């Protein structure tokens, strides 16, 4: 019997985002450490690392209230975060391609000489390093595209979807505010300040 293959880092990230989208709830780390292994097959030991990577990439929001951190995710925000990441990676890849082309030209000029020169050796090393960097960037671009093959098209067509999602989350936020007032006795303006909720926060028409 073959050994069961573990989840890749990207699979863990995708499955953890599914928890937020499917439940539309707010979690503490200890909640995720119970739910993620049971429902998504993410090992308990890796939950904190995966969750932090999603926070770092802007896919998941985190707010500290009292002594605890609370985590939640907005569907529309995730789409825009992926779009921004793709734009950055595409820009870096484009710059890398231009540098690569310029170095190729420089090496061709260096080859005209009859003997190996120090300049040619240096250019060859730089070209090799740049080639490796370019391949890494290409791989990362593809990773983000593979995470959701239709992400670019979704972003173009997401206005209505994002509006509906935002209004659903508006419901959730109002529910969370009510819960926080009951649970912690917080005043509404303090909750708004902690969560960065603007005074004119309301449903989108």
From Swiss-Prot:
Q: Where in the cell is it found?
A: Nucleus
Q: Which InterPro entries does UniProt cross-reference here?
A: LZ3wCH, Mnd1, Mnd1_HTH, WH_DNA-bd_sf
Where is it predominantly found? nucleus
| Entry-annotated residues carrying N-acetylserine | 2
Q: How does it assemble?
A: Heterodimer with PSMC3IP/HOP2. MND1-PSMC3IP interacts with DMC1 and RAD51 and binds preferentially to dsDNA.
Q: Which gene encodes it?
A: MND1
What name does the UniProt record give this protein? Answer: Meiotic nuclear division protein 1 homolog
Query: What Gene Ontology cellular-component terms does the record carry?
Result: nucleus
Give the signal peptide, or none: none
The text of the family note is: Belongs to the MND1 family.
Picking any one GO molecular function of the record gives: double-stranded DNA binding
Task: Spell out the coiled coil positions from the record.
Answer: 83-173
Protein purpose:
Required for proper homologous chromosome pairing and efficient cross-over and intragenic recombination during meiosis. Stimulates both DMC1- and RAD51-mediated homologous strand assimilation, which is required for the resolution of meiotic double-strand breaks.
One biological process GO term for this chain? reciprocal meiotic recombination
PANTHER family, A to Z: MEIOTIC NUCLEAR DIVISION PROTEIN 1 HOMOLOG
């Amino acid at each position: 019997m073959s050994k069961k293959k573990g989840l890749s880092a990207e699979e863990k990230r995708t499955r953890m985002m599914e928890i937020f989208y499917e439940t539309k709830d707010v979690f503490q780390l200890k909640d995720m450490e119970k739910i993620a292994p049971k429902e998504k097959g993410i090992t308990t030991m890796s939950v904190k690392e995966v969750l932090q990577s999603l926070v770092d990439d802007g896919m998941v929001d985190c707010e500290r209230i009292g002594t605890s951190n609370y985590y939640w995710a907005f569907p529309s925000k995730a789409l825009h975060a992926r779009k921004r990441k793709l734009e950055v990676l595409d820009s870096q890849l484009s710059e890398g391609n231009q540098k690569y082309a310029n170095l190729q030209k420089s090496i061709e000029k260096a080859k005209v000489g009859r003997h190996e020169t120090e300049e040619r050796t240096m250019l060859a090393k730089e070209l090799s390093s740049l080639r490796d960097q370019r391949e890494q960037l290409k791989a990362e671009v593809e990773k983000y595209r593979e995470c959701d093959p239709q992400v670019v098209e979704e972003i173009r067509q997401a206005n209505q979807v994002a509006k509906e999602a935002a209004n659903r989350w508006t419901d959730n936020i109002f529910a969370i505010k009510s819960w926080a007032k009951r649970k912690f006795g917080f005043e509404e303006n303090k909750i708004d300040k902690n969560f960065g909720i603007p005074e004119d926060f309301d449903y989108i028409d």
